[in-house]
Amino acid sequence: MSPRMVTSGTELITLVLYPVIMKLKFIFNMASALSSPQSDRGVVPKPVFTANLRPCLALLLMFAFSVLPMLAQQLGAPSAKSDTTLQSGPSNVADPPPDESTEAMFPHFKDSRFWLSGQANFIFQTHPPFPADYSGAHSLGPNYEKATSRVMTLYTGVRLNNSTELLVDIEEAGGAALSTGLGLAGNTDLDIVRNPLLSKAPYLGRGMIHKVFALSKDKVENTRSYLSLFDELPRRRLELRFGKFSLPDFFDVNSVASDTKFQFINWTTDNNGAWDYAADTRGYTVGATADFEDRNWGFRFAEGLMPEVANGINLVWRPWQVHAENFEYELRHGVIPKKEGVVRLLAYTNYANMGIYRDAIIQFEDHSAPTPEMVPDVTNHPWHITRKYGFGINFEQNLTPYLTAFARFGWDNGKSESFAYTEVDQTFAEGLGANGAWWHRKQDRAGIAFVSNAIAKDHQTYLADGGLGFLLGDGGLNYGRENIIEIYYTAHVWRGIYVAPGLQHINDPGYNRDRGPVLVPSFRAHIEF
């Protein structure tokens, strides 16, 4: 991309998005002023209301799925009935509807060679004090906290010819995370920047060439977006992509749980937590993908660069030595007769300078007179390349024209350190996504999900001995699975403006039975340009 394009992108973000952003920040600041100041990260005694969290959560669930839709219907004009026509795969009932005249702030040109759009996403979260017998350097703070994250993106693209396009996105991310993003395997906000020291200046998010090779003459309709500008594609085709992108753009995609702008926001609800996919701390890698698509199935492969260190911003530019391989098979066939569904099978292998938990534990235990300050350190090793591998299953099934069920399962070998995504070695997630057309609010949607995360035995021992991962480290560990319930309701306010209250309940945060449970309410404001 030329310097002139970068300058134009930055100016557009500043001139168009900035006034709206400042108004939203004012709203968040007013809401925050009604709460007490943020506390320190000390130990909090167990409150007497802990036993009542479960019934309170049940009441909140009932409220969200019964009262909020009715309120939304009263506050806005009813929309037209949902169009559930599909070209391939399941109906994306929880996705933004295709009527772009009301979905975005400004209309998108459907027949143009060019693409220009944008988005701004703000997520405000807080949590009250929760019980914690102790806290460590990488714990979720047990006292009251509040934080607001933001992500703004300018999407641009140009179709070079009938089979090739160039896609370039400029992004800006900032704000803050609860406890700077530490203490949870299933973090409550996927939009947070995991390294608070990164520059707040706009950066290149995506920049790639997309090439399509036709393998059949018949065509299928394609919905234009920032990832593909084509109006139609060959039914049987090979798609190649080269450049900078995020692997979840093309792998482990789920129509119910993959998008923090309209759907869930927990890390392990929107993505497979055990998929330690190649990425820098902002979630992007450099590499290539190959995607073969046929009538009711597809197979894709991706090769991407890995970071230098866990959660690092710099990638290792030696793909013959440090790299990640990803494979996914997709079958577009439902398990319920006459209802559409999809099953996706994922496998991956990473090669990087990763430490081994067992080696760190042995090194720690071999000290003849360990001091209280001595803890195992999985990063204390010479440069070497180790292998990490895992697999995942991604399932979605239409139940009605307005309701879709989803499930994910993931596993990795758990021997090498968690390196690029989060500290999960096994995960299971299930949930429901509903389209607001069910209650005559076509652009609204709602969802509920349950996630259960776990780590391997060596990983448990490492944390119990006081070791620190790049996200977890309470100084000790009374191990238990980290179980999460998440609900949300996204309401369309006007044109491209959406708001979404949400709630997450987390048992055994950071896999520690000596801490929690914790309740995290949230409020999301989203603008589509």
Task: Say what each PLM segment does.
Residues 122, 158-160, 170, 211-213, ...:
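Residue-level signature of outer-membrane beta-barrel architecture
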Residues 330, 346, 350-385, 406, ...:
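Outer membrane beta-barrel transmembrane domains
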Residues 112, 146-152, 200-205, 282-286, ...:
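Residues that define the transmembrane beta-barrel architecture of outer-membrane proteins
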Residues 120-126, 168-172, 240-244, 301-305, ...:
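Transmembrane beta-barrel strands of outer-membrane/channel proteins
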Residues 205-218, 448, 517-529:
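Outer-membrane beta-barrel "beta-signal"
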Residues 104-116, 128-129, 158, 162-166, ...:
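Short loop/turn motifs that connect adjacent beta-strands in outer-membrane beta-barrel proteins
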Residues 182-199, 203-206, 216-324, 328, ...:
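Surface-exposed coil loops of outer-membrane beta-barrel proteins
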Residues 21-24, 31-32, 65, 70-144, ...:
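N-terminal periplasmic/intermembrane-space "pro-region" immediately following the signal or transit peptide
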